[in-house]
Structure formats: C-alpha cells, structure tokens
C-alpha cells in the first residue's frame, strides 16, 4: 500500500498545482467556474496552514461573488476568511481585502449597517497600513454618503486627509480634500466648501510635481468648482472655470496622454482614482449640459446630451459600470426639461420613460430610490404643460414629500404655486408662497430659483391687478437674471412686464419689453414666451393701427398654437402618457412600438405648456424648468 506524502514541500506543490488549475478554469473561454471552485475546495482537504486557508476562503468568496448568484456561500467563505485572518499579523492584504469584499456583499443584500460595522473594525485595525487605512476610509465614507449620513462621511474624509498628510502622500491628501468638498457641497455648507476648494487648489498649483496627476486633480477640482457655481445659479460667474475644465479634459483625452495605469501605478499611495478619464469625459459633458440649460441655450444642451449619451453607450459595451446609469439618468432629466421649454412634450415623456427604464434596470431599485422624486417632478412638469393640473399637483406633492434636497423642493413648490394661480386657489397659493419665503429667507439658495420665486410673486400681483407691485417683483427678477445671464428667466420676466405695461395702457414700454423678450425667446428657443409675446405684439400693432405687423404677429401666434395642438394630440395618444397616473411604488412599464428613446434627434416642432386659443394670451403662465 502506498502512502501519500505530506511533507511541506509536497503540500506546497499541491497548493500551487490546484491554484494553477483553478486559475486555468477561471480564465478559460468560456470560464469553467464549477471546476475552478472544485480545485479551490480541494485545497482544504490538505488541512493547509492558517494563512493559506484564509487566502483560499477569500479566493472562493471572490469567485462566487464575481461569477455566481450564490451570495450565501460567498458570505460564508468570506466570513471564514475574516475570522482566520483578523488576528494574524503581517497579513494585511488578505485581511483587509476580505473586509472590503464582505462590506460590498452586505451592500448587495441591502445590509448597510453590517457593511459599516465591518469597515469600522477594518479601519481600526489598519491604522499602521496607510494604503489600506485610506482605502477603507474612502469605502466607508461612500456608504455613509449613499445613506445620506453626510456629517459622518465628511468626518471620515477629514481623517483620511490627515492620514495622507502624515504619510507625506500629497496627491492622496488632495483627493480626500476634494471628496470632502463634494460632501459639504451636498450639505450646502457654502463657506466650508470654498475654504476646502481654495486649500486644495493651492496644493494642486504648488505641491504636485507629477504633471499628469496635477492635470487629473485639476479636472476634479474644476468639476467641483463648476458644480458649486451652478448650484448657486451663477451661470455667468462659472464661465471661466467651465472653459478651463473643457480645456483640461481635452488634454487628458489626447491620444498621447498616458494611461491611468501608467500615471497611478507607480506608488501604492497614488493608486487612487476618483473616476477614470473616460468617465470624467462624460461628466464634463454633463456639467456642460447643465450650464447650457440654465443659461437658456437649449440647442447646445441637446447637442451635448446626444454626444454624452453616445459616449455612455460605448463605455457600457466595454464594461457596464453602475455610474454610467447614474450619468444617463441625470442627462435624460436635463434633456427632458429642455424639450419642454422648446415645446416638444411628446419627446419629453418618451425620455422620462427612458429614464424610468434606466432606473428600473439597476438592481435593488437603488437608482430609482435616489431619482424617484426627480421623476415625479418631471412628470409634474409634463402634466402641467399638457393641462392635466390635478395630476401635476399630485406629482409635485409626491416630489416635495419624497425629496430631502432643498432646491428640488423649492423648484416643485414654485410650480405648485403656478398651478394654484392657474386654478384660482388663492388660499393654497398664499400658504405656499409664505412657506417658500420663510424657508429661504435665511439660506443662500440658487439665484435662478430665487429669481423664479420673485417671478411667481410678480405673476401673482399681475393677476390681482396690483401692477405696481408686479413691476417691483419683476424688476428684482430681471436684476438677478441679468446679473448671471439667466436668459430664460430674463425672457419670461420681460414678456410679463410687457403684459403689465399693456394692461395699464403704456404701449411704448410694453413694446420696449416684448421686443427683447421675443429676441431671447427665439434664441433659446422658448415656445412659451413666443406664444405669449406674439399675442402681445398682435395687440400692440392693432393699437398702433399697423395692420401688416398685426397680421404677421397673429400668423405667428396661430402657428405656435397649431404646433401646440398637434403635439398635445401626440402626447395623449402616447402609451407613456399613462405615467401621469404614477404616484407611488415602482413606475408602470409603458411602451410604444415606434420608440427609440436613448438618443433622440432634435426636432424643430414646437408647442406650449398649456392649450390656449390664439385670442387668450393672458392665460399663458410658463413653468420653471
């Protein structure tokens, strides 16, 4: 009878052979995961040393997580790996890799408290290993941020910045500073954000010797700076930063630029990347779309959205990263608002449906949870623009109740105010205007939204025939809009001011207001202002007995109205129109046989936000998107 040798040398040979076989089966085309797992499982029959056993359990967990749906078995192997590795010295890679993977697994099963507890313990144990300490701090702060525990996330990032500084890792310190600035921006801690951005900016300029890392950090810094200004509605102020950002991303995307692996692979403490350059490229498109939309350049916003969506589809074919779905939803949310400004509401509801599909495709409905309030708000705008006011009101109320974002709440409330104005609900209107005024008096909100608030008050005063009060509010709106080149707000204010002057018989001032309003509206283009302005022009030309110009203005007004009616007909016939009845839970799945929603071609067809007869311009109100 032969005896199997159990000498250390022969055991090592068995381990190496089995690991080699496991890797062979894993990398086969197609992978043979069953045999890979069998090879790894066979290692345990040799009663390997603790470190080999822990590493093998980790490998089993990695394979099961990556290639199977057997979450429970993956968890058991990772928990065994952790229980063996936790007390062992000089075994950091296996120990902390296991902790990191276990946290990811807990998140997959929606147990974020377990993930946080696991990472907190790992952070505590990793204090003598700067690389793992910082990596685990970033992972833990990300989970807290996802759970909207922003103060905890910010504190962890501050600890990371200190750890990086103590280790002399300047690049890593700046990453922590910028990440913390991003969290503080979400918390609307304006002064703290500015202080952090200034501090990080000085380090980037003076203390990052590697030019490629410097350019990369500059892109991160400029993205945050642009987002900071846009969040405050400072569309004009942001222009130099946005231009600089666009130039920096072109530098990084140039063919001769080194790969991310080359730039960040030389030093362990530099192996941290906020986003790979291909994703940064999409992000720069996204902030450019946001700027174009806020500035009132709808054609530009459409053009950049289509380019960004094309780039996202290319990246998804290479590797379908979850952040690409986030980018896609945000882009669709922006383009939906552009479509409605231009009067293409049937296209808008298609793209709302496309955003819904992206959200529903993400596991555990995580993306839907984060964007449900925005979708309700968009459907509210669509319902409002197609004169389904009861549906619009309910959608905005759902949005207000679901969201924790102050600006989104203000945005929805302003549109609710317009609905109450249209439907002559004076008590509800007063209540909402008082609430908005109280909530935003002592806080620094977006200049665009506060300008919108003054506009709604001006509109309210106009409908009470308080023309002096209306002029006062609208001049305040114009002052804010002109200061930051908020073209759409400017055109809306001018056309309403024109109507105020028309109502008090001052035709000269009315003409002085409506002329630039129409010029801006055609540049945007904003069908709502064009419809309203053409009606005012028709009346002004009739008063001055200019029959030719009166006829032209009337023809334009009829054209806008007919486009509106045609688009309205398409809207109510669309299967996606059913979304106006979604008020809770998962949105209904709707489909149109002719639908190609992802990347859509701009259309020149226009309509307006409410069905109006050409003879009734006074009922036109507009919306705030």
Swiss-Prot record:
Q: Where in the cell is it found?
A: Nucleus, Nucleoplasm
Composition bias, kind Low complexity: at what positions?
612-625
What is one cellular component GO term in this UniProt entry? nucleus
List the keywords (alphabetical): Cell cycle, Cell division, Chromosome partition, Mitosis, Nucleus, Repeat, TPR repeat
Note down the stretches annotated as region Disordered. Answer: 600-625
Q: Does the keyword Cell cycle apply?
A: yes
Q: What InterPro entries does the record tag this protein with? A: MAU2 (IPR019440), TPR-like_helical_dom_sf (IPR011990)
Task: Locate the compositionally biased regions of type Polar residues.
Answer: 600-611
What residue spans do the TPR repeats cover? 96-129, 451-484, 491-524
Any one of the GO BP annotations? maintenance of mitotic sister chromatid cohesion
Domain of life the protein comes from: Eukaryota
One Pfam assignment:
Cohesin_load
Tell me which PANTHER family the record gives.
MAU2 CHROMATID COHESION FACTOR HOMOLOG (PTHR21394)
Entry function: Required for association of the cohesin complex with chromatin during interphase. Plays a role in sister chromatid cohesion and normal progression through prometaphase.
Fill in the subunit field for this protein.
Interacts with Nipped-B to form the cohesin loading complex.
- Protein name per the record: MAU2 chromatid cohesion factor homolog
The protein's organism comes out as Drosophila mojavensis (Fruit fly)
């Amino acid at each position: 009878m032969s005896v199997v040798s159990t000498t250390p040398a022969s055991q090592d040979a068995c381990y190496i052979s089995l690991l080699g076989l496991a890797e062979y089966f894993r990398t086969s085309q197609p992978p043979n995961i069953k045999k890979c797992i069998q090879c790894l499982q066979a290692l345990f029959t040799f009663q390997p040393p603790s470190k080999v056993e822990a590493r093998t359990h980790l490998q089993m967990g990695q394979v099961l997580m990556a290639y199977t749906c057997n979450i429970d078995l993956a968890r058991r192997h990772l928990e065994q790996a952790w229980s063996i590795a936790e007390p062992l010295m000089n075994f950091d890679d296996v120990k902390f890799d296991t902790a990191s993977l276990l946290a990811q697994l807990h998140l997959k099963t929606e147990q974020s408290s377990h993930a946080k507890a696991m990472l907190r313990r790992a952070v505590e144990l990793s204090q003598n290993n700067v690389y793992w300490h910082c990596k685990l701090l970033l992972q833990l702060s990300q989970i807290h941020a996802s759970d909207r525990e922003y103060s905890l996330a910010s504190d962890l990032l501050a600890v990371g910045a200190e750890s990086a500084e103590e280790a002399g890792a300047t690049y890593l310190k700046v990453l922590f500073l910028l990440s913390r600035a991003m969290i503080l921006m979400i918390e609307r801690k304006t002064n703290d954000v500015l202080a952090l951005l200034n501090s990080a900016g000085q380090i980037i300029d003076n203390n990052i010797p590697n030019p490629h890392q410097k350019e990369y950090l500059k892109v991160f810094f400029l993205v945050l700076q642009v987002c900071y200004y846009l969040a405050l509605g400072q569309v004009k102020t942001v222009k130099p930063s946005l231009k600089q950002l666009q130039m920096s991303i072109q530098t990084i995307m140039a063919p001769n630029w080194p790969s991310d692996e080359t730039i960040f692979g030389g030093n362990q403490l530099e192996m941290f990347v906020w986003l790979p350059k291909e994703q940064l490229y999409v992000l720069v498109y996204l902030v450019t779309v946001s700027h174009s939309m806020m500035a009132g350049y709808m054609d530009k916003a459409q053009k950049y959205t289509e380019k960004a969506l094309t780039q996202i589809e290319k990246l998804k074919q290479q590797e379908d990263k979850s952040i690409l779905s986030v980018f896609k939803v945000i882009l669709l949310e922006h383009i939906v608002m552009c479509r409605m400004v231009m009067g293409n509401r049937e296209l808008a509801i298609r793209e709302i449906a496309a955003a819904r599909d992206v959200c529903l495709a993400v596991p555990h409905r995580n993306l839907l949870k984060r964007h449900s309030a925005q979708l309700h708000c968009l459907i509210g705008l669509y319902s409002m623009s197609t004169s389904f006011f009861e549906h619009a009101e309910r959608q905005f109320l759902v949005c207000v109740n679901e969201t924790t974002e102050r600006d989104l709440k203000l945005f929805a409330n302003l549109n609710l105010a317009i609905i109450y104005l249209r439907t002559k609900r004076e008590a509800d209107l007063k209540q909402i205007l008082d609430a908005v005024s109280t909530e935003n008096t002592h806080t620094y909100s977006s200049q665009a939204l506060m300008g919108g608030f003054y506009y709604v008050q001006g509109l309210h005063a106009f409908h009470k025939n308080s023309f002096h009060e209306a002029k006062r509010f609208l001049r305040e709106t114009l002052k804010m809009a002109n200061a930051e080149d908020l073209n759409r707000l400017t055109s809306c204010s001018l056309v309403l001011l024109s109507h105020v002057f028309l109502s008090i018989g001052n035709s000269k001032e009315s003409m002085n207001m409506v002329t630039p309003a129409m010029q801006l509206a055609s540049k945007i283009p904003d069908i709502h202002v064009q419809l309203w302005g053409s009606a005012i022009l028709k009346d002004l030309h009739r008063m001055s007995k200019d029959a030719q110009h009166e006829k032209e203005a009337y023809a334009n007004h009829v054209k806008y109205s007919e486009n509106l009616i045609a688009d309205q007909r398409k809207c109510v016939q669309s299967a996606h129109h059913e979304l106006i009845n979604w008020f809770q839970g998962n949105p209904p799945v709707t489909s149109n046989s002719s639908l190609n929603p992802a990347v859509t071609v701009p259309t020149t067809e226009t309509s307006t936000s409410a069905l109006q007869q050409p003879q009734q311009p006074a009922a036109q109100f507009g919306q705030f998107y």
